[in-house]
Amino acid sequence: MKNFNQFFLEKQVLGLVELFDVDGIGKIPSKLDSGNGAFNVLHGDKDSIQLQGNKVLFKTVNNKHLIKDKIDEIVINTGGGVMDTRNVVEFNFKIGNKEFRNIPFSIGDRSSNLYKILVSKDFIEDHLDALIDVSQENIADEEIEASY
């Protein structure tokens, strides 16, 4: 069994906001949200999202127009009983020196949000295996040392 110090020494520390270098889009400030349930969300302009067969066409950050394979569809309760049906697509991206492939994202309108990517608790736990320092931003590239 790991002791308390071993548990923390083995974890990567990330800031509340990290730059995700997303294939086809570029670097996007992304919020790591441990309160967000099961799905990562990437901004898609709501007026641009189209479904053509098994392909999702949409405009996203920096006016990039993308065509992605639809892998799923989810229904999200956005609050106040409002349900939003979203297409799910996969992206490859890099955070610091770690690369991730074929990670699912729902496409949602985040035009009123400061951060155009919202990272889910499940991704943080299952893939990043990191601790989030909410007082920090963009530290994924830094070597952080902890002393006890």
Which ranges hold each PLM region?
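Charge-dense, intrinsically disordered terminal/linker segments
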Residues: 1-11
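Pepsin/retropepsin-fold aspartyl endopeptidases
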Residues: 9-148
